[in-house]
Regions:
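Short acidic-glycine-tyrosine-enriched beta hairpin
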Residues: 71-85
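An amphipathic alpha-helical interaction segment
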Residues: 144-204
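Histidine-centered metal-chelating micro-motifs
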Residues: 82, 87-93, 113-114
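A hydrophobic/aromatic-rich effector-binding and dimerization subdomain
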Residues: 95-159
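Short beta-strand His + acidic residue motifs that chelate non-heme Fe in jelly-roll/DSBH
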Residues: 66-68, 90-98
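Short helix->loop/beta-hairpin flanking segments within DNA-binding domains
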Residues: 204-219
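Generic protein-terminus/edge-of-domain signal
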Residues: 1-68, 72-74
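Basic/polar phosphate-binding segments, predominantly the helix-turn-helix DNA-binding elements
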Residues: 208, 220-256
Length: 256
């Protein structure tokens, strides 16, 4: 194995279950499949670059963290939400530094969703496949809603387990995901100027593609191809085009 590759792999922490992350930050779980962490109670914490086998929703209130991702750098600031899904890698490599954080993290294992409506429905929340530089920036009101839901899930976890506990927790998680989708919809609307600029770059990309006759060798450009050229994830790019034009990115390409 390449030495640099082996070193990079050694720096990635595998989060196979919620307990792996909780133990790293010094949090004690009350449930094997779901964890709610108030960072104010465990700080200071070290950075970690994680390979997730669980779902995670993270937001911080104060800390500013530079994360390298994709085509540039991203400043993780107050009121920013990042969602991760199993199979994804995210975070910042441990460099020995300890940081004071205030904010919350919700992690839950896919097994928690087994035989529930959310088991299949979670695939509809495309923001789990957004890049970190496409994160949600919350308003103060949206932030308060997220904190309230985090506390409600935590309160439920502190109760004596019964046959309805998992269903109630999954219900809260689905409610949080729906609010997250609503907040993203608001963000797409409030970023009309930025989205218009991306749309112009999209048009320019398609124009150059056909003027250079690239379609003769590669065929019709795909959403993945266009998103990569614009340094965006396919899901965020597709959602942005849909919100901006009312049409899907694939239809927009075909009709160009």
């Amino acid at each position: 194995m390449d030495t640099n590759l082996a070193y990079a792999m050694a720096k990635i922490m595998k989060i196979r279950n919620v307990g792996d992350y909780s133990r790293y930050v010094g949090h004690t779980d009350r449930h094997p499949l779901v964890s709610v962490i108030d960072y104010a109670e465990v700080s200071p914490v070290r950075h970690s670059l994680n390979n997730y086998s669980v779902y995670g929703i993270f937001f911080h209130d104060e800390a500013e963290i530079d994360l390298a991702y994709g085509c540039g750098k991203y400043d993780y600031k107050k009121g920013t939400v990042i969602c991760v899904a199993p199979g994804q890698i995210g975070g910042k490599e441990d460099n020995g530094e300890q940081v004071m954080l205030t904010g919350w993290a919700l992690l839950f294992h896919p097994d928690l969703l087994h035989a529930t409506h959310l088991e299949k429905a979670i695939k509809n929340y495309s923001f789990f496949d957004y890049r970190v530089n496409e994160a949600l920036h919350m308003t103060d009101e949206e932030h308060d809603i997220f904190v309230l839901l985090m506390r409600q899930i935590r309160d439920e976890l502190q109760k004596r387990p019964d046959e309805l506990q998992n269903a109630i927790i999954v219900g809260y998680i689905e409610l949080m995901l729906n609010f997250c989708q609503r907040f993203y919809n608001r963000q797409f609307i409030t970023r009309k100027l930025e989205n218009s600029d991306i749309l112009m770059k999209f048009d320019s990309l398609l124009r150059d593609y056909y003027e250079e006759k690239t379609q003769l060798t590669l065929g019709i450009p795909t959403v993945q191809y266009c998103a990569d050229k614009l340094c965006m994830s396919p899901n965020y790019f597709g959602d942005m085009i849909k919100k901006t034009t009312g049409d899907t990115a694939s239809n927009y390409i075909r009709q160009y």
